[in-house]
């Protein structure tokens, strides 16, 4: 029995030796997590109609904004590279990382207090198309999420960052699965009694479990938490690198908030349609793009630190080609099989056929940028590994302004339905990635991309031919694909 526990422990805390093995573990666990995530969405669609789900999804907008600024802005671009840089000195590592975590958490408390006090004032400006009763419900649920979910989720994500910096990915990948399970269970057992409070309760419990399950990572790390805030070199580096990335996230969150605002003018259920279509498109992006990006950062940072520029260049070319090889066929599948996919994932009792069709069309326009969206996360990590967070920031600001401009034109000038927001997103994402690619090429210098362009062309042509043949050889008379 002791031998069994020892093997289990070694398996859970084993360190990965390559990007491929790390990305594989992350991808498998993200697939499982996303599977439960879509069971969550299907469960919600079975208990609540799309108008009611508007309230639920809109309640996450403000908590998500705070979370993205503090965690996505801090963790992905700065925390992991700094952790790796100081991990050879245990004392300095513990002081520096503890200071960073404590500083961010104090900032979180400040945001929570301010937002809870003034939420009723500015929420009507975010959701102007909602009734007063609907806005009051959004405010109530937003406060519960700010107070009950956010602290656990923020601390849990710092543990995730520590695990990834140590190249220990299994436990950090299990945590989101349990988060989704908690929401599903709470909805099934309590939705009929406490309505939308049931999934909100599940979110809070899930966030707590998300934190607790990752606490063992502290034991198996050279980092020892200290309750201190100390002016260290690492803290200054952290904020110097974080500020551009945080501004990128702020602009992106403004973009997401404007999307919510615009959908409130498009009728009841529009935000649910937009939200579900976007998250279905994010399934392959998360499994492939985000997983690969997360797994690549520690290795890219290490190569840059050791001056292995040629290996860095080779990994960039090979990684982009591998990502295209996986995502271009998936993009085609999502476009041609959009309606069955939406019905499969979201076809609950209260999710009617009109909602299915509108979500499917929106999904197809989101999917056009799927390969570029997947590569985006890897390209930004390349810049972060080179200790450059400013370039992705400037490019993101430009692409987000483009997205907002197109969205406003499509909705208020041409009066297009909700799928127009997906066209705006895809256009801006493609532009973003193309500019990132060009600037990264210049930054690395002397990189041969001929094989990348040649193989990508082959993949694209083969995918197009296979998709067209499959589409027109389907059962005669069917028009729902």
State what each model feature region is.
Residues 2-481:
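Membrane-embedded alpha-helical bundles of multi-pass transporters/translocases
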